[in-house]
């Protein structure tokens, strides 16, 4: 029980540390700035797509009202009115103006993907046609699916089994959870589809559930603050809604990025988190596996390494292989794996450590045991090196500073 509690606390602490390392607060601020300029283009594109289908006429206004009533605190009514006016003006733009709005919406999606790729340590973002098709699908099919789902839910809510005198017990209670379920679905889709890497659906679902619950809590607390502390009206007057809306967007992006860190953290092996190895040792492990594969005439894949007992986090695997590729020690094979591209018989451990960005670990950083054939010899060499260092630098600091005399 104590071990589980320790692992649980360590897991959440590691998530917080990664959030700080990835500049989560700064990225949330950047996304808030981007959202400020992209919200009107996104709404314009959504209304344009919905108005193109006669069955969805007027659905856009209903969707907008549903979003502001359920996903934005009580200050959203004024902002909604502003956005409605801006969107009405945007509909009168020429095709060139509409194109600029679409580009703005595209840039917002690009910024979101870049931020997620930093969290997932993805070094190759989507490019070319794959990137264009994904963003186009979000901007075109997204509003249509949203409109269809909203129309279906409205029809279901109007059935006598839901709202009539013969309504099923608990049906209205279930409908009350519709905003929460919508949030879970939206967050899950965001975490599963946006990163340019494979994200397990169950991890995306857990992250979506976490973010949706945190989102509802934040909305309730934010609304409570607005009602109990109205002093901001004395400062900003009629414009008080605008800074509050920006703060809410910022909090929303903080929640999104925290959920993304959780989804990434769930995919990392727990045993590995409990027993971290110095990066220099990971480098030697990967080289040993590459050498063993080369002797069999095969390439090394990340999945095969995990099945072999090395539950190495994917970001550490990528960092090590990037270094080996830069130093022309390993290269990609045609099948997606990795092979050695240099004869290790003519390359010493000293040469490797000289060009490695990761320093040689101290004895205190080494695990007691490691199932690697080279590990006993390395540990003995480090012990001799430490003893020699003590012998060379064991005199008092005052003697060193005084110099020979």
From Swiss-Prot:
<feature type="transmembrane region" description="Helical">
    <location>
        <begin position="238"/>
        <end position="258"/>
    </location>
</feature>
<protein>
    <recommendedName>
        <fullName>UPF0761 membrane protein Pmen_2988</fullName>
    </recommendedName>
</protein>
<keyword id="KW-0997">Cell inner membrane</keyword>
<feature type="transmembrane region" description="Helical">
    <location>
        <begin position="132"/>
        <end position="152"/>
    </location>
</feature>
<dbReference type="InterPro" id="IPR023679">
    <property type="entry name" value="UPF0761_bac"/>
</dbReference>
<feature type="transmembrane region" description="Helical">
    <location>
        <begin position="93"/>
        <end position="113"/>
    </location>
</feature>
<comment type="similarity">
    <text>Belongs to the UPF0761 family.</text>
</comment>
<keyword id="KW-1133">Transmembrane helix</keyword>
<keyword id="KW-0472">Membrane</keyword>
<feature type="transmembrane region" description="Helical">
    <location>
        <begin position="204"/>
        <end position="224"/>
    </location>
</feature>
<keyword id="KW-0812">Transmembrane</keyword>
<dbReference type="GO" id="GO:0005886">
    <property type="term" value="C:plasma membrane"/>
</dbReference>
<keyword id="KW-1003">Cell membrane</keyword>
<feature type="transmembrane region" description="Helical">
    <location>
        <begin position="36"/>
        <end position="56"/>
    </location>
</feature>
<dbReference type="Pfam" id="PF03631">
    <property type="entry name" value="Virul_fac_BrkB"/>
</dbReference>
<feature type="transmembrane region" description="Helical">
    <location>
        <begin position="174"/>
        <end position="194"/>
    </location>
</feature>
<dbReference type="InterPro" id="IPR017039">
    <property type="entry name" value="Virul_fac_BrkB"/>
</dbReference>
């Amino acid at each position: 029980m104590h071990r589980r509690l320790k692992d649980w606390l360590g897991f959440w602490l590691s998530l917080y540390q990664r959030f700080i390392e990835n500049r989560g607060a700064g990225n949330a601020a950047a996304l808030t700035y981007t959202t400020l300029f992209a919200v009107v283009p996104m709404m314009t594109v959504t209304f344009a797509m919905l108005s193109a289908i006669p069955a969805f006429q007027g659905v856009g206004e209903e969707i907008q009202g549903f979003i502001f009533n359920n996903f934005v605190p009580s200050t959203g009514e004024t902002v909604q009115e502003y956005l409605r006016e801006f969107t009405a003006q945007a509909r009168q733009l020429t095709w060139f103006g509409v194109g600029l709005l679409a580009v703005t919406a595209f840039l917002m999606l690009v910024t979101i993907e870049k931020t997620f790729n930093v969290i997932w340590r993805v070094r190759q973002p989507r490019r070319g046609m794959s990137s264009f098709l994904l963003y186009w699908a979000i901007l075109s099919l997204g509003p249509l699916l949203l409109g269809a789902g909203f129309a279906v839910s409205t029809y279901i809510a109007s059935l006598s089994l839901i709202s009539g005198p013969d309504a099923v017990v608990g049906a209205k209670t279930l409908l009350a959870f519709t905003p929460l379920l919508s949030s879970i679905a939206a967050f899950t889709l965001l975490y599963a589809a946006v990163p340019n890497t494979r994200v397990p659906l169950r991890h995306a679902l857990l992250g979506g559930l976490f973010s949706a619950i945190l989102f509802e809590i934040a909305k309730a607390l934010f609304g409570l603050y607005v009602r109990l502390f109205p002093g901001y009206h004395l400062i900003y007057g009629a414009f008080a809604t605008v800074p509050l809306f920006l703060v809410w967007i910022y909090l929303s992006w903080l929640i999104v990025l925290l959920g993304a860190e959780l989804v990434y953290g769930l995919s990392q092996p727990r045993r590995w988190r409990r027993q971290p190895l110095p990066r220099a040792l990971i480098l030697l492990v990967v080289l040993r596996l590459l050498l063993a594969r080369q002797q069999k005439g095969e390439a090394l894949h990340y999945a095969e390494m995990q099945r072999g007992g090395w539950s190495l986090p994917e970001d550490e695997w990528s960092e090590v292989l990037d270094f080996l590729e830069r130093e022309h020690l390993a290269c990609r094979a045609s099948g997606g794996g990795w092979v050695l591209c240099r004869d290790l018989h003519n390359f010493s451990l000293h040469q490797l450590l000289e060009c490695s960005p990761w320093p040689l670990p101290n004895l205190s950083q080494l695990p007691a045991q490691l199932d690697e054939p080279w590990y006993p010899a390395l540990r003995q060499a480090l012990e001799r090196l430490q003893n020699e260092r003590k012998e060379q630098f064991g005199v008092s600091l005052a003697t060193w500073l005084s110099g020979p005399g």
